[in-house]
Amino acid sequence: MRGFLHHLFRDKSVATMLLTASFIIGLCALAPSLFVLIVLDKYLASGITSTLISLSVGAIILLCFEFAFRQNRASMIQALNRKIFQPIVNALNKKIKETQISGEEFKTIEKAGAVIKGATNSSITGYILDWPFVLMFVIALLFINWTAAIIASIFMIIMMVLTAQRVNLNLQQDSTANLEIFLMGLMTITILAIGSYSVLQYGNITLGALIGSNILASRALQGANKFAKAREAIKQRDRATAQIISFVNKK
């Protein structure tokens, strides 16, 4: 991750804008779960239509803001990646044209170049930038439903460990996707089962808080999964970059 931070803060003004955009995106991402919580707890209790309309309009506006900021952030990330990695790719292409290399070495360098091209898309950097605000979801969960926060944290750790070890487990991409779906469904069942019991037996949580906390937990688990994948992609990109720089500088 040190390489990622160095890469990000090469242009401090762009880094500041990216972090600001990520903060706003994180806040706006809370809208669906808070909307469910307030509608189920407040509107159904009062029955005032104007309250529902106001809440719906507010939630839609926040979702639009989230979409707009994500689009803007993606454009900034792509521009930053091109500025940093395009010169490396150009230097590689020039070196290959000027140097005679074996077929095996060419395959290795070509693979490294493909890794860089694939890992410079905006999604990977975006997933890393979203990670602090994924943790914010867990903190919000602690105030809404601490049981769901603990369950979500456990599943997040499991998801991240399995994602990091997927090579050792020899899991294909389809198998990994199936595992993600399984963990997501299992977490939902666990949260709703324990939460429903708490609603009936202790009354220490409302129905709106239960459903809202499940939405937040799902977003947190998805964020953990994306972060783990992005972290592995960043590691591969750093190794590929080192290979290419070593090859380009070789006399």
Please state what every model-predicted region is.
Residues 37, 41, 45, 66-74, ...:
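Membrane-water interface at transmembrane helix exits
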Residues 1-30, 45, 49-55, 73, ...:
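Membrane-integrated ABC transporters
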Residues 220-247:
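Cytosolic ends of transmembrane helices, especially the final helix of ABC transmembrane type-1 domains
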Residues 58-65, 210-226:
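Hydrophobic transmembrane alpha-helices
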Residues 30-37, 125-167, 172-214:
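A hydrophobic transmembrane-helix motif
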Residues 17-24, 58-62, 151-155, 176-180:
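Alpha-helical transmembrane segments of MFS and MFS-like solute carriers/permeases
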Residues 1-2, 78-118, 167-169, 238-249:
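Extended non-transmembrane interhelical loops and adjacent amphipathic helices
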Residues 32-39, 57, 73, 77, ...:
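Hydrophobic/aromatic residues in alpha-helical transmembrane segments
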